[in-house]
Amino acid sequence: MDMPKVTLEKNNKPTIVLMTRWHAIYRCKSRLSKDIGAHQASKIQEELTNHTIEVAKQIQKKGLANIKVAIDGIGIQAAKKWGLKNKVRNVAIQGPGNLGTKMKRQFFKTQSEKTIPHEVPNSILLIGTDLPSISNCDLIEAIEILTHNEMVLGPSTDGGY
C-alpha cells in the first residue's frame, strides 16, 4: 500500500496523543477479563499499548508528528519512568473523569503546550490503544486529512471513539 504524502511546515507538526491505561491486573480490560481472565487481559492491554506506541514512533521518526502518551491507572513518577523505558519523552496522567472529560483535558493541555501566541494551533490526534490493526499509513492519512479539516473521526465498530 502506498503511503500518502504529507508536507508539513517545520514548526507545524501535529501531536499524536495516545490514550491508554496501565496494564495492571484487575485494573484494565474488565469486560475482556471476564472471558479470558484478568492476567491475560492485562497482557493484551500491554501488547496493544506497545504496538500503538511503536506505530506512532515510526511517524515521529519520519518527522511527521510528535507523540505524547496520556496514561490512566499509574502515578506520574511511575509513568515518567515507564515512558523513559519505552523511549517516550512526553508522558502525562489522564486525570479524573469519564473518557470524554479525559480526552478534552488532554486536547486542551496539549494545545496549550504547543501554541505560540498569534499562531494557529498545531493539529492534535487523539487515539486509543485498542487498535490492533493500526498502521503508520492510518496515522499519516489522518495527519493529511487534518491539514485540510478541523476534525477527523475515525471509524469504530466497538462503541468506542
Where does each model-flagged region fall?
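Short glycine-enriched, charge-decorated loop/helix-capping segments at active-site entrances
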Residues: 31-40
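Short phosphate-binding loop-to-helix
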Residues: 80-122
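Short beta-strand/loop segment that forms part of the nucleotide-sugar
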Residues: 65-73
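A short, N-terminal amphipathic alpha-helix
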Residues: 45-63
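N-terminal nucleotide-binding beta1-loop-alpha1 segment
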Residues: 2-32
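Conserved donor-nucleotide/metal-binding helix-loop-beta segment in metal-dependent transferases, i.e.
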Residues: 132-159
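Short, charged/polar "capping" segments at the starts of alpha-helices
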Residues: 74-80
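Short aromatic-hydrophobic micro-motifs that form the base-stacking/packing surface
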Residues: 123-127
